Curated annotation (Swiss-Prot):
NCBIfam families: L9. The keyword Ribonucleoprotein applies. Gene3D superfamilies: Ribosomal protein L9, C-terminal domain, Ribosomal protein L9, N-terminal domain. It comes from Shouchella clausii (strain KSM-K16). This is Large ribosomal subunit protein bL9. GO terms for molecular function: rRNA binding; structural constituent of ribosome. One of its GO terms (biological process) is translation. The keyword Ribosomal protein applies. PROSITE patterns: RIBOSOMAL_L9.
Amino acid sequence: MKVIFTEDVKGKGKKGELKDVSEGYARNYLIPKNLAVAATSGNIKDLEAQEKSKQKKAEAELQKAKAMKEELEALKIEIPAKAGEGGRLFGAVSTKQIAEALGKQGKKVDKRKIQLDEPIRSLGYTKVPIKIHPEVVATATVHVVEA
């Protein structure tokens, strides 16, 4: 019997997957526990419509991320910090400070999306990658100035 899984079932199938399982397993376990529905033509059309809307939503997110990338790369992020001789900072500039500086400029970015290998410890310009979307990474320019 063909069924469409409505939830992940370990070892059998993932949510939204169309699969052939034994009649008894489907009627006595999967369908009563709402883990799957019978694969009728109506249910298959619903599944296809859901997948289409998911694709459209993912495409819209990707476009939004690309637009955000353009905006972030155009911004100049300036962070004041106390520095000693030779441009070495007292302390360091972390992802949290970069996220706050972006927030002040109207761009809300989660600090976990800022991919800084190690905190910035010197004055000057630094290129910082920001992962906006799994497929889109913006490279922002952070300028650390002496306070």
